Amino acid sequence: MKNIRNFSIIAHIDHGKSTIADCFIQFCGGLSDREMSSQVLDSMDIEKERGITIKSQSVTLDYHAKNGETYQLNFIDTPGHVDFSYEVSRSLSACEGALLIVDASQGVEAQTVANCYTALEQGLQVVSVLNKIDLPAADPERVMDEIEDVIGVEAHDVVHASAKLGIGIEDILEQIVERIPTPKGNINAPIKALIIDSWFDSYLGVVSLIRMIDGEIKIKTKIKIFSNGGEYIVDEVGIFTPKRKRIDSLKAGEVGFLIANIKNIDGAPVGDTITSAENPASESLEGFRPVQPCVFAGIFPISGKDYEKFRDALAKLRLNDAALQYEPENSDVLGFGFRIGFLGLLHMEIVQERLEREYDLDLIITAPTVIYEILDTKGIIHRVDSLSKMPTNQSISKFREPIITAKILVISKYVGAVMNLCIEKRGIQKNIIYMSRQVSLIYELPLNEVVLDFFDRLKSVSRGFASMDYHFERYQESDLICLDVMINQEPVDALALIMHRDDSVRKGNELVEKMKELIPRQMFDVTIQACIGSKIISRSNVKALRKNVTAKCYGGDVSRKKKLLDKQNKGKKRMRSVGRVDIPKEVFLAILHIN
């Protein structure tokens, strides 16, 4: 065990984490030059295209160090985005050390800080690396100061590297061997292993990536999952090199995979503990919690014929994504679809993109909402994620909304613009810390103001120089209302929104004007109204198309023309009472872009 090193990589999106991982694999001979491709560990197409890591991955490499010994390096590649922070915390708890990679030109970003603090809280040894030192814009001195100021980690022994050119890779590996401690654990104690990640394989069932804490798991060992009590017999254990390689057993301190004929992903939840069914450990590992979605949206197929295909596609995605939760939903306007819960906005985009790309579906997505707490007049608290589940306005006593604490890192030049954005989104400033070049802003913000367009606006007001990390703080009472949209006196359930009363008139007017532009003209007048309960706060009309019925009347008595116009008006009135307005897809997309 003294020659095992377990470590994770902490880095912001696009700071070169997956490229450094590729260099490690090449340097240690995990794959031949012919088998190498860029971003080896990012298995999904969408991961490679967006340049992000979504699922945790692991590789076991043998490194021949300068001191003549051979070390087993177990390296766990983790996601870098705030939506996947639970996966990051579980991956970190499986390690004794972490590699902090910072782009030498961009400097420290908020997500890196959050993950680094998680690592330090868990007692991990942090090894700092400055990547991309070959870039003309690289400023190693400034970034080293930032690492010390913002994160509080010693930066005098930072390794300078360029993964693209292969500079400094051996120095990083030597630092890992020297500075990261050996794993603790007892091979003779009852089995205890942490599930770092699980995914579904259509031939093997659920494959779990595990870190052995105590004991030894062999083929035919009978194991038990702590949280749900499920018992299984192990069919196969092994390691990734990064190819799947079978071995005889996994011992305390090692990281590898386990296959035990588990049929669905809920059978092996991320962060759970595995023990022996015959001789179980007395208690589970700390920190396990079921994954809770915090953003909800309705997704509907454009063609009703695609509903079955959509349902099957969701079931397949769910096999690999335990955080994805869904239930059927029916909308008068959009037909049958599903209400889906996501970890955050990036997670929502990725799920939508995978459904459209991998399963060839055309989908409409409604405005995302969060979970509200509603206290009714009888004192009962309802947790509501959809307007269709709302109690009536008369029975609502109090509205509570989720509040988050956001940490925003921005260069000093754009502080004013970012503060104005936070104020516009009903943010309350809690702290502001000036550092050498960056400023750290701590704000409390309502989550429903963040889910629509906050990230896009933050990037645009800061010219891309701001980054943000957030965590849930509490529920807080707020003056929220339900804004309904009616077309020809018919409420359109899919367009209803929950918002703060102060914003309702402005947003109602914007919504109605936008819809007036987008709804095509009909043979009758179309009335668009925004209302709160029975109070109309905004109204507009889409004028009817009309045929010139008097064109064939030349001269003669005016009563003939009046008779024809009256007949036309009666026809329009009858048409309006029976006619339906088809709302184009663009209207729903426009709602998402209303500020």
Curated annotation (Swiss-Prot):
EC class of the enzyme, as a word: hydrolase
A Pfam family of this chain: EFG_C
Annotated gene: lepA
Annotated organism of origin: Vesicomyosocius okutanii subsp. Calyptogena okutanii (strain HA)
Name the record gives this protein: Elongation factor 4
Keyword Membrane part of the UniProt annotation: yes
Domain of life the protein comes from: Bacteria
GO BP, sorted A to Z: positive regulation of translation
Enzyme Commission code(s) on record: 3.6.5.n1
Entry keyword set: Cell inner membrane, Cell membrane, GTP-binding, Hydrolase, Membrane, Nucleotide-binding, Protein biosynthesis
GO MF annotation terms: GTP binding; GTPase activity; guanosine tetraphosphate binding; ribosome binding; translation elongation factor activity
Function, as annotated: Required for accurate and efficient protein synthesis under certain stress conditions. May act as a fidelity factor of the translation reaction, by catalyzing a one-codon backward translocation of tRNAs on improperly translocated ribosomes. Back-translocation proceeds from a post-translocation (POST) complex to a pre-translocation (PRE) complex, thus giving elongation factor G a second chance to translocate the tRNAs correctly. Binds to ribosomes in a GTP-dependent manner.
Record's keyword annotation contains Protein biosynthesis: yes
Membrane topology designation: Peripheral membrane protein
Record-linked Gene3D superfamilies: 3.30.70.240, Elongation factor 4, C-terminal domain (3.30.70.2570), Elongation Factor G (Translational Gtpase), domain 3 (3.30.70.870), P-loop containing nucleotide triphosphate hydrolases (3.40.50.300), Translation factors (2.40.30.10)
Covalent S-S links between cysteines: none
Subcellular location: Cell inner membrane
Catalyzed reactions: GTP + H2O = GDP + phosphate + H(+)
GO (cellular component) term, any one: plasma membrane
Ligand binding (GTP): 14-19, 131-134
PROSITE patterns in alphabetical order: G_TR_1, G_TR_2
Domain tr-type G: 2-184
Annotated family: Belongs to the TRAFAC class translation factor GTPase superfamily. Classic translation factor GTPase family. LepA subfamily.
InterPro entries: EF-4 (IPR006297), EFG_III/V (IPR035647), EFG_V-like (IPR000640), G_TR_CS (IPR031157), LepA_C_sf (IPR038363), LepA_CTD (IPR013842), LepA_IV (IPR035654), P-loop_NTPase (IPR027417)
